Amino acid sequence: MENMTSAILEGLNSEQKAAVSCVDGPVLIVAGAGSGKTRVLTSRIAYILERGGDPSRILALTFTKKAASEMKERIALMVGERKARRLYMGTFHSVFIRFLREFAESLGYPSAFTIYDTSDSISAIKTCLK
C-alpha cells in the first residue's frame, strides 16, 4: 500500500499533496483553470480508496461527460477498475439518475422510467392536446 500511496502523491506540489492526504473531512479546492484541480480530486479519491475507504461512500460530481470520463479513467488506472466502478462519480445528471434507479423501488416507485428532454416534453404535450 505504501508504494501505491507514494505513486498517487508523485508529481504533486506541497499544497496538492496536503489536499490529497487530508482524509478527515471535506476539502474545498479553489484554483484557476489548468492548475490541477481534477488531478487533485482524482488523486484524493485514489488515496482514500488505497487507505481502505469504501468506494460506495464517495460522491464525485462534475459538469461534463468528458470530465467525468477522464476522472473515471484516471482513478481506474490508480486503484483498479473494480473499485472505480463502485464510486458514485459522473455528471450531476448521470449520478442522480443512478440514485433514482437504485432507490426508486424502496420509495414505492418503479426503477424503470424515462426522463424526457425538451423535445420529448413538447411532443407529449402536443399528443395530450389532440
Language model feature labels by segment:
Residues 1-110, 115:
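P-loop NTPase Walker
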Residues 119-130:
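Coupling/switch/interface segments within P-loop NTPase motor domains and analogous charged loops
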